[in-house]
Amino acid sequence: MKKIFFAAALAGAAMLASCGGNKSGVQMGSLSDFDSLSYSLGANIGYGMSYEMKDIPFDFKLVDKGIKEGAMGKASQEHDKSLDMLREYFMSKRGERAQAIAEKRAAADSVRLAGGDSTKVEYPAADPEMFESEEERAEISYAFGNDIGYNVAQSGMPIQLVWISEAMQNVRDNNAKMTEDEVNQYLQYYFMVKRPAENAEASK
């Protein structure tokens, strides 16, 4: 099944929100009652990150903080500033640092082989050197979360933030309550069936 990555999902949600006039549906929520939409969205974000950003050692506590504060309109950083930071990092710094790390590892492997050591070294997927400092790691992690939170709020969906956080953590821990296919199926149902029906009813 074709994957629905979170950026596309949120873009679709924002378009539907503009049609239906629902601009505010975000709340912190409670883990006492499972929320399929919020969990699916969080798992979708988590799965997307595990594929496309596994090389980046985010501070996930700050990502989570950014999501919640951004979604509730309480971010300590303007969304435009977060976007500028993310563009610079992902369009320039990320690629340069990934290349430098790959070259460094290749050189280390060559030295070992030259010394007669053929043992294969398993390098971590996310290298700390993807960030130049802990300060930059914190800034990018928060900005990334703030961008997600901002777009969640703009989507107008009835989202419980605790379930987004829970799902993202579950995906990282490899114990998600929904498989990737189940997540995709639910989001397709929500965007193509449930949400349009709700918007049509609201516009009467």
Language-model region placement:
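Post-signal-peptide N-terminal segment of Sec-exported extracytoplasmic proteins
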Residues: 30-73
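Positively charged n-region of N-terminal signal peptides that target proteins for export
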Residues: 1-4
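Extended amphipathic alpha-helical interaction segments
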Residues: 113-137, 143, 150, 154, ...
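FKBP-type peptidyl-prolyl cis-trans isomerase
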Residues: 41-47, 66, 141-151, 167
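C-terminal motif of bacterial Sec signal peptides marking the signal peptidase cleavage site
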Residues: 15-18
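Bacterial signal peptide processing site
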Residues: 20-23
